[in-house]
Regions:
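Catalytic active-site module of serine/aspartate enzymes centered on a nucleophile-bearing elbow/loop
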Residues: 279-330
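Domain-level recognition of soluble alpha/beta enzyme cores
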Residues: 1-70, 91
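Gly/Ala-rich beta-loop-alpha elbow adjacent to hydrolase catalytic centers
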Residues: 150-154, 158
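Alpha/beta-hydrolase active-site loop
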Residues: 113-144, 159-165, 169-196, 208-213
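Catalytic nucleophile-loop/oxyanion-hole region of alpha/beta-hydrolase
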Residues: 76-88, 105-130
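Short alpha-helix in the alpha/beta-hydrolase fold that links the catalytic acid
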Residues: 235-237, 244, 258-272
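Active-site glycine-rich loops that stabilize anionic/oxyanionic intermediates
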Residues: 66, 73-78
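Short beta-strand/loop motif that positions the catalytic acidic residue
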Residues: 242, 248-250
Length: 330
């Protein structure tokens, strides 16, 4: 089945961007089943491999509305970085809709606010689900409810949408669960930015929302891929109240977000969850795309796996898990 690909820009008119110069941007991209005669072309060369798609092709008609999966990237990442999952979901009949989270994405300059206020990412997906412009672009019938899959910080986002609530932000000084780092690789001094940012009105508004509920009952199930240490700041009471199905998956060799510390903890506190820790040397970045030679040269730490591990096989396994999970969660 050919896979169509479209992208666009929506706005959340209820929230300002971090500079308060306009509405918060919601840059999105989507993979979906296209008509059988759609012509697929190879995307422009980049740091990672991408499967050919049919740009802006008409969506293949179906008897019933198509199921929707929202995708949430990791810290400093891109929606297109989950192409490996989105494309496979589309081949299975789903519509996969990803977003670049403002201030926390590689598609624009990094903002400390975006890296600290992770709860705004959940509001991004709720706002995108509220919007109609991407539906008009894609055409076809798409369900109003959705599923959500996220990697790393995206897993945190997914959990917020099914009912997790923040007790402590990972880097706030009062957090009793002290982080072993001061920030992620993209923003290593992140914790040190908090005192000055608290003088900024728009940051303070968001910071004061951190313990709000971002649950969206339209989200029927969540796939949490390699959740990071930020999930340890969720309130256990909120996790115990989650009823939506949750699938947690991690890697046995993840040193960024150790599976026994993060995946297992999350699973033990969410009664409706299942857990799989993949063996064979699966690391945190194994869940990122396969590299091109250009990407491997530019970012070997991100694109190099242990000897004998085939990243494509890991992606195939997780995608099949996602397809089966979301198909039975309907």
């Amino acid at each position: 089945m050919p896979v169509g690909f479209s992208q666009g820009l929506s706005f959340d008119r209820k929230r300002a961007n971090w500079s308060r110069t306009g509405h918060r941007p919601l840059a999105w991209c989507a993979w979906y089943p296209a008509n059988d005669d759609a012509v697929e072309i190879a995307p422009a060369p980049s740091w990672f491999k991408q499967t050919p798609v049919a740009p802006n092709a008409p969506m293949k008609k179906s008897t019933d509305p198509r199921s929707l999966v929202l995708l949430s990237h990791g810290s400093g990442g891109l929606a297109i970085g989950l192409e490996w999952l989105g494309h496979r979901l589309a081949q299975a009949g789903f519509v996969a809709l990803g977003i670049d989270h403002h201030g926390h994405t590689g598609s624009e300059p990094y903002r400390a606010e975006g890296f600290l206020c992770l709860w705004e990412r959940a509001a991004d997906l709720t706002a995108l689900l509220d919007a109609n412009d991407w539906r008009e672009v894609l055409g076809g019938a798409i369900e109003n409810h959705a599923y959500v899959a996220g990697f790393s910080a995206g897993a945190y986002t997914a959990m917020l949408l099914v009912g997790a609530c923040v007790a402590y932000s990972q880097f706030e000084p009062d957090n009793p669960q002290k982080s072993p780092i001061r920030g992620p690789r993209e923003f290593p001094d992140l914790a040190d930015q908090i005192p000055s940012l608290l003088q900024d009105e728009i940051f303070l508004e968001s910071w004061n929302r951190r313990r709000d509920s971002f649950r969206d009952d339209r989200l029927k199930a969540a796939l949490a891929i390699a959740p990071g240490r930020s999930v340890l700041g969720f309130s256990k009471e909120s996790l115990e109240e989650i009823t939506a199905p949750v699938q947690v998956v991690g890697g046995d060799a993840d040193v960024i977000a150790p599976a026994q510390e993060c995946c297992t903890w999350l699973h033990e506190n969410v009664r409706s969850s299942s857990l799989e820790i993949m063996g064979g040397g699966v690391g945190h970045y194994t869940f990122l795309p396969e590299p091109t030679p250009q990407g491997l040269k530019a970012a070997p730490a991100v694109f190099t796996d242990v000897a004998g591990l085939v990243r494509e096989n890991v992606h195939n396994h997780v995608a099949q898990m996602a397809i089966a999970f979301f198909s039975t969660a309907r």
